[in-house]
Amino acid sequence: MGTDSNSGHLLQAKRFELLFRVTPLALCIAAMAIMLKNKQSNQYGALHYSDVGGFKYLVYANGICAIYSILSLLGSVLSTGIDYSWTRAWIMFILDQALTYLILTAGVCGVEIMDLAYQGNEQVSWSRVCVSYGKFCNDARASVLITMAVLVCFMVLSLLSAHRLFSKYEAPIVNNGHHTDFSQN
């Protein structure tokens, strides 16, 4: 009974992981598509996402995360067993952490640019761009918000891969040679 329950739990965990590996793929593609098409022209001139270095970084980061999502999804689907080896668990943990930080920096960069675009900064002569380029700002905001949703997915993946990796280790030995079992409440 315990083995069937454990196997069912592992299968459910794998399905949950697959969901969080496919979701950021769709979100990254959506964020990239919105930003790549983002441009607006008016009497003040033309504005394109590529005119803003931080938005280019956002597109690149979403592209890298989308590629990683495809590869990690394929790796998860094509894996022969439910359990990961030590090496694979470490690799997934490190890559999940790295991509989480990558998309975090891209999202924060986008948020900062949007704050400057909406609020301006008179000390550095940055005017409120969104007053004149409303459509551009709305599309950029949508892309940044979707990128932040990608961040949440990658945070969950980081937690899952950390749990998968560190649950492979024994509990530490404490006083008098007794093991501490943290799995019981």
Swiss-Prot record:
Record bears the keyword Transferase: no
Pfam families from the UniProt entry: CASP_dom (PF04535)
InterPro entries tied to this protein: CASP/CASPL, CASP_dom
Transmembrane spans: 16-36, 58-78, 91-111, 142-162
Intracellular or extracellular location(s): Cell membrane
Keywords on record: Cell membrane, Membrane, Transmembrane, Transmembrane helix
Source organism, top-level taxon: Eukaryota
Topology relative to the membrane: Multi-pass membrane protein
Residue numbers on the Cytoplasmic membrane side: 1-15, 79-90, 163-185
Topology feature Extracellular, residues: 37-57, 112-141
GO annotation, cellular component aspect: plasma membrane
Similarity field: Belongs to the Casparian strip membrane proteins (CASP) family.
Subunit structure: Homodimer and heterodimers.
Protein name: CASP-like protein 2A1
